[in-house]
Amino acid sequence: MSRVSQARNLGKYFLLIDNMLVVLVFFVVFPLISIRFVDQMGWAAVMVGIALGLRQFIQQGLGIFGGAIADRFGAKPMIVTGMLMRAAGFATMGIAHEPWLLWFSCFLSGLGGTLFDPPRSALVVKLIRPEQRGRFFSLLMMQDSAGAVIGALLGSWLLQYDFRLVCATGAILFILCALFNAWLLPAWKLSTVRTPVREGMRRVMSDKRFVTYVLTLAGYYMLAVQVMLMLPIMVNDIAGSPAAVKWMYAIEACLSLTLLYPIARWSEKRFRLEHRLMAGLLVMSLSMIPIGMVGNLQQLFTLICAFYIGSVIAEPARETLSASLADARARGSYMGFSRLGLAIGGAIGYIGGGWLFDMGKALTQPELPWMMLGIIGFITFLALGWQFSHKRTPRRMLEPGA
């Protein structure tokens, strides 16, 4: 085996272990924020939505800067620094007793994420061959689901004692993740050339096809982020106990572990990437609309199952498509900018979703936020269809297995 192939194989295993750790620790804390501050402390959902939206916007919206800096200086220093900053954010969250302190803790967490997330994504593009990326992204997403369940179970168990214990555990584990990367992550460069920060950003902004694709995905993310805000609140409201939230993530894990990789393998040879993305989005949109009208957990979990199945169909195609469009001369910048749709859609989804949820309760129309999310999903579906029309998009980009 050549040294290059050996480095790629070792890199794959490192990425898988590192991804599992990061996802697990994230889900120890973040799914419980809405339960802690809305249900236990009585805050308005919009206040928590602002905090979650701020974290999302900072982490993803500034990703192009984090990626461009990583293009210049390498992945390792950015990843280690970002993880330590997220640990500081979790520690601050544990003592939050006013909205501004929760917002500040989410700001720190988001800033840490904008430092470590783009270089980690760029390492996947660097180390995984193009024909293997779709399957590798599926493996990462299966890990995401398993990590989400384990993290949510651990967080829910710790919440029985004290939310400060939840946050302290998250902070300590992120410090351990930083030490793991500092010790084992080689000093890899992300791009084929040492790209100046400004040049990497310029390359991305001049790529109109990529920019349009990323911004269109904002509507997709408005739906996707509700697994962190409105869905946990809905499950808690109907079940009457925050312990039921862990079953929501257990459903996601079961579906992902059993369906994600087989669906990706089967569909990659039969359907274009954009068809898989749009089909998943359509299923997610249809499953959102009736959620506000359900009256028991069985009905709610059935719709959540449908939502997760849509995500299982869409996510590998979305990630593979983003990676295939990245310029090898500025991988960090591209993967950083690819998060802008999540920044915009996530911020609007959290803040707007929280506001609509409060409004629906005030007007005794609980279906209001879910109907609006379904409409946004359909509009995004149509926008993607327009963008991916053959007159506008090169055929090579859309071929099965591309």
UniProtKB/Swiss-Prot annotation:
| TM segment ranges | 13-33, 99-116, 139-159, 165-185, 214-234, 244-264, 277-297, 300-320, 340-360, 368-388
Q: Which InterPro entries match?
A: MFS, MFS_dom, MFS_trans_sf, MFS_Transporters, Multidrug-R_MdtH
List the GO cellular component terms: plasma membrane
* Any one GO MF annotation of this record: transmembrane transporter activity
- Would you tell me the protein name for this molecule? Multidrug resistance protein MdtH
Key words of the record: Cell inner membrane, Cell membrane, Membrane, Transmembrane, Transmembrane helix, Transport
What spans does the record annotate as topological domain Cytoplasmic, numbered to this chain? 1-12, 117-138, 186-213, 265-276, 321-339, 389-402
